[in-house]
């Protein structure tokens, strides 16, 4: 049995006076009974966000959102002959071995009349006071009616760092919101907020609702001053701003500003994006910025070929590529740095015999990334393509089409690489460590191959935004040694320690 978790880390960009780093972790938590005939899986989605409280005694807090899939729980009959489930939750916030705050509680599901067709979700929201600092957040979830030998546990580092000056809270994607006078963990500044379970917007969802807070603009800029708040959507892959999704509003300075808004995304193509809040002062300097990562599925949207037809290929560098097989090959190499829409469109384009359209598309691709020197941008990129083809080519794929090649072309060369090809009991693996990855910090990629002779290393885990994450990745590396344990301990997220097992140490402490 294989297990896959989804892990996104959303980080705010460090901008001058805005030094606060915010991380959102989205986990697909799975725990099961081993070797049970009827396996019941606890499926939960967890995210968290950071907020500030201004005033004479400023403070900070983390807000956690745990959403449970009701159909994944084990139900028991209560005294009223109805059914409910119970989940035990433990959340620790630690610095070293010192626990700075914690939550230990049980959550009861909504009451069900019967268990035949249970569906839907329910959410638990909690708040934890945490002063500025770096913490390890440890989460343990257990179905009280379906206990395992070891409940599923996961850890992640969070950084709370609200400066005294201008700063923006984390951005929450909202399922819905409404005005409310109630006081509860789901209300904030006069609104009842229901966060999104996951940052995924299918074609049936055409509105992106969000909430954020802006702090201390009056302290930094002065009372009765103004600043610009830009709200826009940009491509995750290259940061390019989408023209139809850029909004500007002049704001008055105050202690705390509540931002709650909607954006129509009916015509937003499929892909990975950031929703960005960016504040600028009178000198047009960026004084605050934060981002919300989300995914959009909109299969009805396609690139309009008429937008390319105006390009005169005789006047641009791509017109000099007259061999159709060559330009097909060149377009294929763009996949690692393309948006989803570009990948889908180009995959269909290269199936045709339309050389001119390929030339027009190729130029447009590079002009959108470097309008001044598109040819140089392509030549620099192609030099890297040749490098990865030389280093990462496998039996069946050119280097750019392999997982290592894609990561290298998308993010650049890693700062450190651990290569472990001969560790006893382990499949050959590599761990790549990036000190910085755009606005992200300290991100890692784990690759593994079943046969070193093929040079075909597959990505099995990363903690970077939008990348595959599997918190049981060590079980993949060591499963030929711990095969029986791997099959039995399906609720485990790591192999037992033994002599010669170094993967986790290499991951935590890159050489």
Ranges and model annotations:
Residues 19-24:
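Sec-dependent signal peptide recognition
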Residues 27-35:
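Hydrophobic h-region of N-terminal signal peptides that target proteins for export
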């Amino acid at each position: 049995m294989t297990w896959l978790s989804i892990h996104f880390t959303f980080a705010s960009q460090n901008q001058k006076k805005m030094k606060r780093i915010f991380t959102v972790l989205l986990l697909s938590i799975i725990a099961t009974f081993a070797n049970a005939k009827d396996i019941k899986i606890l499926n939960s989605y967890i995210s968290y966000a950071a907020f500030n409280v201004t005033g004479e005694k400023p403070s900070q807090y983390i807000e956690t959102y745990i959403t449970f899939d009701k159909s994944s729980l084990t139900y028991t009959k209560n005294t009223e002959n109805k059914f409910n489930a119970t989940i035990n939750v433990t959340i620790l916030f630690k610095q070293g071995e010192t626990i700075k705050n914690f939550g230990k509680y049980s959550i009861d599901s909504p009451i069900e009349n019967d268990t035949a067709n249970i569906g839907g979700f329910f959410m638990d929201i909690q708040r934890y006071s945490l002063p500025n600092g770096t913490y390890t957040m440890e989460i343990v979830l257990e179905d009280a009616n379906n206990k395992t030998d070891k409940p599923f546990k996961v850890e992640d580092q969070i950084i709370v760092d609200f400066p005294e000056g201008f700063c923006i809270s984390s951005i929450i994607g909202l399922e819905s919101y409404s005005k409310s006078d109630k006081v509860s963990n789901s209300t904030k500044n006069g609104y009842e907020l229901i966060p999104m379970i996951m940052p995924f917007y299918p074609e049936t969802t055409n509105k992106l609702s969000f909430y954020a807070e802006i702090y201390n603009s009056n302290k930094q800029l002065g009372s009765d001053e103004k600043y610009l708040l830009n709200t826009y959507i940009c491509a995750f892959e290259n940061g390019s701003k989408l023209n139809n999704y850029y909004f500007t509003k002049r704001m008055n300075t105050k202690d705390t500003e509540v931002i709650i808004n909607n954006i129509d995304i009916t015509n937003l193509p499929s892909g990975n994006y950031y929703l960005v809040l960016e504040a600028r002062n009178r000198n047009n300097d960026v004084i605050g910025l934060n981002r919300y990562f989300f995914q959009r599925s909109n299969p009805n949207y396609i690139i309009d070929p008429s937008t390319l037809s105006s390009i005169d290929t005789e006047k641009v560098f791509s017109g000099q590529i007259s061999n159709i097989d060559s330009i097909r090959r060149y377009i294929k190499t763009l996949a690692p740095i393309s948006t989803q829409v570009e990948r889908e469109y180009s995959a269909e384009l290269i199936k045709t015999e339309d050389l001119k359209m390929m030339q027009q598309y190729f130029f447009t691709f590079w002009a959108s990334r470097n309008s001044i020197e598109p040819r140089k941008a392509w030549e620099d990129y192609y030099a890297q393509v040749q490098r990865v083809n030389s280093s990462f080519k496998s039996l069946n794929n050119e280097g750019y089409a392999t997982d290592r090649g894609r990561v290298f072309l998308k993010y650049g060369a890693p700062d450190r690489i651990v290569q472990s090809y001969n560790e006893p009991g382990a499949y050959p693996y590599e761990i790549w460590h990036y000190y910085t990855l755009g606005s992200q910090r300290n991100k890692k990629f784990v690759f593994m191959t079943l046969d070193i002779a093929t040079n075909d290393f597959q990505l099995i885990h990363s903690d970077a935004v939008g990348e595959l994450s599997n918190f049981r990745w060590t079980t993949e590396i060591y499963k030929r040694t711990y095969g029986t344990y791997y099959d039995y301990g399906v609720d485990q997220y790591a192999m037992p320690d033994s002599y010669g097992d170094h993967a986790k140490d290499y991951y935590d402490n890159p050489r």
